[in-house]
Amino acid sequence: MAEITTIARPYAKAAFEFALEQKAVESWAEMLNFAALVSENETMQPLLSGSVASGKLAELFIGVCGEQINEQAQNLLKVMAENGRLVVLPAVAQQFVELQREYAKEVEAQIVSATELTSEQLQALSVSLEKRLARKVKLNCSIDTSLIAGVIITAGDLVIDGSVRGKVSRLSDTLQS
């Protein structure tokens, strides 16, 4: 996984910087996501494994993508095909989105709660997190009844466990030590 991230990072960064320069970040995100979906297709997977010459593979891949990608994105795909890197397209698309969020000073926060939160509670969480992280926060909520009560918030490296299950677990660890 770390190797794929390392391979994908320069492609994502180059694409993002170009998209930013061209003021086309959204369209590039869409093109990369589409190309990533094509690369994950079960019919395309065997071709990406290296059984096809890079020039032919690039031509085939671009043909499948059709008009969904522009000339500059086609150039990126050609370079990736020449280097045998089309298989990392999903990671490139994911890192592109991360760069996009970082640039926009946005962060995605996972909120896991024991019960469904009200809109007022979600608003309060959003405001608090935005203040603490100095970024715009997008909340993704889910319910896990095993928490008993409370919430677990994960935003980037930050993890706040305010659940009863977490408190019981920490208390148990303290008593055992």
UniProtKB/Swiss-Prot annotation:
<comment type="subunit">
    <text>F-type ATPases have 2 components, F(1) - the catalytic core - and F(0) - the membrane proton channel. F(1) has five subunits: alpha(3), beta(3), gamma(1), delta(1), epsilon(1). F(0) has three main subunits: a(1), b(2) and c(10-14). The alpha and beta chains form an alternating ring which encloses part of the gamma chain. F(1) is attached to F(0) by a central stalk formed by the gamma and epsilon chains, while a peripheral stalk is formed by the delta and b chains.</text>
</comment>
<comment type="similarity">
    <text>Belongs to the ATPase delta chain family.</text>
</comment>
<keyword id="KW-1003">Cell membrane</keyword>
<keyword id="KW-0375">Hydrogen ion transport</keyword>
<dbReference type="InterPro" id="IPR026015">
    <property type="entry name" value="ATP_synth_OSCP/delta_N_sf"/>
</dbReference>
<dbReference type="InterPro" id="IPR000711">
    <property type="entry name" value="ATPase_OSCP/dsu"/>
</dbReference>
<dbReference type="GO" id="GO:0045259">
    <property type="term" value="C:proton-transporting ATP synthase complex"/>
</dbReference>
<keyword id="KW-0813">Transport</keyword>
<comment type="function">
    <text>This protein is part of the stalk that links CF(0) to CF(1). It either transmits conformational changes from CF(0) to CF(1) or is implicated in proton conduction.</text>
</comment>
<keyword id="KW-0406">Ion transport</keyword>
<keyword id="KW-0139">CF(1)</keyword>
<protein>
    <recommendedName>
        <fullName>ATP synthase subunit delta</fullName>
    </recommendedName>
</protein>
<keyword id="KW-0066">ATP synthesis</keyword>
<dbReference type="GO" id="GO:0046933">
    <property type="term" value="F:proton-transporting ATP synthase activity, rotational mechanism"/>
</dbReference>
<keyword id="KW-0997">Cell inner membrane</keyword>
<dbReference type="Pfam" id="PF00213">
    <property type="entry name" value="OSCP"/>
</dbReference>
<comment type="function">
    <text>F(1)F(0) ATP synthase produces ATP from ADP in the presence of a proton or sodium gradient. F-type ATPases consist of two structural domains, F(1) containing the extramembraneous catalytic core and F(0) containing the membrane proton channel, linked together by a central stalk and a peripheral stalk. During catalysis, ATP synthesis in the catalytic domain of F(1) is coupled via a rotary mechanism of the central stalk subunits to proton translocation.</text>
</comment>
<dbReference type="GO" id="GO:0005886">
    <property type="term" value="C:plasma membrane"/>
</dbReference>
<keyword id="KW-0472">Membrane</keyword>
